[in-house]
């Protein structure tokens, strides 16, 4: 329940503030690539694909995305409205990521304790990207749409398909960098 309250109602509350106190000129809702209905495709999803995240986290992000689109169509379609976009990013890794079940922090911890690194889905291909890459895209979207509202849209933010690796490969590369064997 808390996940929905945070991701859906948090988005609605923010959009309501923007609607009632129109001082923002450029807004970006950052969701996740997990908003898409998972069809087990081998290729990445496009911005036009159906939204329907399966698990509660992914589904709450789908709902946040849909709520944003609803507000855009209902309240922010005038020329004087703020430009509002949605960015959907894949797996972001980098500094400050100490949440539970995170591949890099978990690998660092296992290495520091000389333990085996446990990889839940070693063959899962994910669009891993360093936190500065999507951040750069977010800032670019906000900056550009502020002066050209026609750029307000939904954007997938991630690496090229050729740069996506399996989780197992990511851990292997990490271990190679540390000269660690799990």
Language-model regions, residue ranges each:
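Short-chain dehydrogenase/reductase
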Residues: 11, 15, 68, 135-138, ...
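Residue(s) in the substrate-gating loop at a strand-loop-helix junction
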Residues: 32
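Hydrophobic alpha-helix immediately C-terminal to the catalytic Tyr-X-X-X-Lys motif of short-chain
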Residues: 63, 67-71, 107, 170, ...
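Glycine-rich Rossmann NAD(P)(H)-binding loop
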Residues: 89-96, 118-129, 150-165
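Alpha-helical substrate-binding/gating segment
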Residues: 105-117, 128-155
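Conserved small/polar residues in nucleotide/adenosyl-binding loops
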Residues: 180-181
């Amino acid at each position: 329940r808390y996940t929905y309250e945070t991701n859906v109602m948090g988005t609605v509350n923010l959009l309501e503030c923007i609607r009632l106190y129109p001082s923002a000129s450029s807004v970006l809702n950052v969701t996740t690539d997990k908003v898409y209905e998972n069809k087990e495709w081998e290729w990445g999803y496009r911005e036009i694909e159906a939204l329907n995240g399966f698990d509660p986290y992914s589904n709450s992000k789908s709902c946040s995305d849909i709520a944003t689109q609803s507000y855009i169509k209902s309240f922010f379609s005038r020329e004087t409205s703020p430009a509002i976009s949605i960015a959907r990013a894949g797996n972001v890794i980098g500094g400050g990521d100490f949440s539970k079940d995170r591949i890099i922090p978990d690998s660092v911890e296992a290495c520091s304790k000389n333990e085996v690194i446990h990889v839940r889905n070693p063959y899962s291909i994910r669009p891993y990207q360093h936190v500065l890459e999507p951040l750069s895209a977010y800032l670019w979207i906000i900056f550009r749409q502020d002066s050209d509202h026609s750029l307000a849209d939904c954007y997938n933010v991630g690496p090229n398909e050729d740069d996506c690796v399996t989780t197992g490969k990511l851990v292997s590369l990490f271990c190679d960098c540390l000269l660690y064997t799990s």
